[in-house]
Amino acid sequence: MKTGIHPDYHMIKVQMTDGTVFETRSTWGKEGETLALEIDPTSHPAWTGGTRQLDQGGRVAQFNKRFGGLSLKR
């Protein structure tokens, strides 16, 4: 492998939505930082078999924040 072209690969902590924490190696963040998940396999409808959750401040909120003042009326 070439030196100096690859991102730093280090240990981080990942906090699941139920509060459990595990360590893994990643290029995200800095050594020892904690990545807090908003959705994970314990809460995602695809793995739990539940119904789909409504937007929790995600895409729809971003769209409304960005384009909320626009109107199609002339």
Curated annotation (Swiss-Prot):
Keywords: Ribonucleoprotein, Ribosomal protein, RNA-binding, rRNA-binding
GO biological process terms on file: translation
GO molecular function, one term: structural constituent of ribosome
One family name in Pfam for this protein: Ribosomal_L31
Keyword Ribonucleoprotein in record: yes
Gene Ontology cellular-component annotations: ribonucleoprotein complex; ribosome
Role, per record: Binds the 23S rRNA.
Record note on quaternary structure: Part of the 50S ribosomal subunit.
Family the UniProt entry places it in: Belongs to the bacterial ribosomal protein bL31 family. Type A subfamily.
PANTHER family: 50S RIBOSOMAL PROTEIN L31, CHLOROPLASTIC, LARGE RIBOSOMAL SUBUNIT PROTEIN BL31A
Protein known as: Large ribosomal subunit protein bL31
